[in-house]
């Protein structure tokens, strides 16, 4: 079971808050709610409150991570894993479609 904060961060990484406000990014078909995701990443900093939430998601197998170096600084990035998307869909009762 995902916490409210975990859901919020995962939806933000997938761009879902924006999708709810954009025409055509959410729709119903055959009685099911669909929502289109236009990204899958979240940049944070070590020591930040969000960093530790994402680390817990990664431990559960619901997120992946990598380090991006920019101007000599290292920034941790996270993405929602396939298992994380399935868990989010099950708990929130919608189906996520990725738009590139």
Task: Name what the model sees in each region.
Residues 43-60, 64-66, 75:
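Short amphipathic alpha-helical interaction segments
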Residues 16, 20, 60, 91-94:
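Surface-exposed polar/charged interaction patches
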Residues 1-52:
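Short amphipathic alpha-helical interface segments
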Residues 72-100:
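Short, amphipathic alpha-helical interaction segments positioned at domain boundaries
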Residues 10, 63, 78-80:
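Hydrophobic beta-strand residues in large extracellular and virion-surface proteins
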């Amino acid at each position: 079971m995902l916490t409210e904060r975990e859901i919020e961060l995962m939806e933000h990484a997938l761009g879902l808050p924006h999708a709810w406000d954009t025409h055509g990014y959410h729709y119903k078909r055959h009685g099911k709610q669909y929502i289109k995701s236009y990204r899958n990443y979240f940049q944070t900093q070590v020591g930040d409150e969000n960093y530790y939430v994402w680390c817990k998601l990664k431990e559960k197998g619901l997120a992946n991570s990598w380090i991006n170096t920019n101007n000599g600084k290292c920034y941790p990035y996270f993405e929602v894993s396939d298992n994380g998307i399935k868990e989010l869909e099950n708990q929130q009762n919608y189906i996520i479609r990725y738009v590139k």
